[in-house]
Regions:
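Conserved RecA-like P-loop NTPase ATPase core
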Residues: 9, 64, 129, 193, ...
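Pre-Walker A adenine-sensing motif
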Residues: 1-9
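Post-Walker A helix-loop "phosphate-sensing" segment adjacent to the P-loop in P-loop NTPases
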Residues: 35-50
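Phosphate-binding/switch region of NTP-binding enzymes
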Residues: 16-17, 22, 26-27, 125, ...
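Hydrophobic positions on the alpha1 helix immediately C-terminal to the Walker A/P-loop
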Residues: 28, 32
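Conserved inter-motif catalytic segment of the P-loop NTP-binding fold
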Residues: 21, 47-143, 147, 154, ...
Length: 321
């Protein structure tokens, strides 16, 4: 399997990045697109801290299809990103903005015409901003979205490209329930995609969190990014970029592994003390899941288990010579 960015965006695939308005989702994906066009690592570590997750990319032509922001703002953002990354002027980036008549992804003829355009550029990443504006006026809560998603899958298969669709989450999505339920629209939308990433943002902050809510391939652990920008003397956007920062990850398998290792740094622990220490650090993770992951780490020789007094299981970190 080939990925455009390490562990992200299989070729071919259909993917959705979604979130509430104002979560910087379009800007974040534009940042990814520019990095792929230039073959640069996406989300380099923030200069002011350590940690975070970066994604090396494979250089490929890319295409952005905008029916949301409008031409002026779209070009302004891409220019600011290109200045930050010192992207060559001949970088393989194709941008369509507010074409009229608009693309109708429910119309196979429109998709066939798009296939021809993609063929001339060789684009391996095609971004649509956004799903609602390319669906030909179809109610996104209706089963008619099945046809839209089928056509986008056909586009991916014929071109061999990764398709990224920018979409919105449901209003008033509260605590509880399955994470994927936040994805707005008919159930066929989520059913048709290979990867869904939800983007959230704390009010007034330039920090965003990205969490996988569906994956048919590799598990994507939660990651976080910081948005940076500056303006010129005229007040226009001069440069912009995202950096990786340490994620606020309290539920993934990686988080469980992290807390197990942290707990064992101070010495050996019996099973009850170990799982309780992890549970204290990760209150939303169940006891059974923690115990299962402890056993998996023992099986992979990532931690040691010996039998102590009264047949108690004692766990320690391996000692490497």
């Amino acid at each position: 399997t080939q990925y455009l960015a390490a562990g992200l965006l299989e070729l071919p695939s259909v993917n959705i990045f979604y979130g509430a308005p104002g979560t910087l989702k379009s800007f974040l994906i534009a940042d990814l697109l520019v990095c792929i066009a230039a073959g640069k690592t996406w989300l380099e570590p923030a200069p002011w801290q350590t940690g975070g997750q970066s994604f090396p990319t494979i250089k490929n032509p890319v295409m952005w299809i905008d029916f949301d922001m409008g031409r002026r703002r779209t070009i302004e953002r891409f220019a600011a990103l290109a200045r930050h990354y010192k992207t060559p002027t001949d970088a393989p980036i194709t941008i369509y903005s507010m074409s009229n008549p608009p693309l109708d992804a429910s119309n196979p003829g429109h998709i066939a015409e798009l296939v021809a355009r993609v063929a001339t550029t060789g684009a391996k990443l095609i971004v649509f901003d956004n799903l609602g504006t390319i669906s030909g006026g179809i109610d996104e809560n209706s089963s008619a979205m099945i046809g839209v998603m089928f056509n986008l899958r056909w586009l991916a298969d014929v071109t061999g490209a990764a398709i990224v669709i920018i979409h919105h989450q449901r209003k008033g999505n509260g605590i509880g329930g399955r994470a994927g339920d936040a994805l707005r629209g008919h159930s066929s939308i989520e059913a048709a995609i290979d990867l869904a990433l939800q983007i959230t943002r704390e009010p007034y902050a330039e920090l965003i969190n990205i969490e996988m809510t569906k994956s048919r391939g590799l598990e994507v652990y939660p990651f976080s990014a910081a948005f940076t920008f500056d303006h010129n003397n005229a007040g226009d956007l001069e440069t912009a970029a995202f950096y990786s920062i340490e994620p606020d990850d309290k539920q993934s398998n990686r988080a469980i592994e992290r807390e197990i290792k942290t707990a064992l740094q101070s010495g050996g622990m019996i099973q009850t003390a170990l799982w309780q220490a992890v549970k204290d650090a990760l209150p939303d993770v169940t006891k059974n899941r923690i115990l299962d992951y402890i056993k998996r780490m023992v099986a992979r020789n990532e931690i040691n288990m010996t039998v102590g007094a009264k047949n108690a299981r004692v766990y320690t970190m391996p000692v490497f010579q």
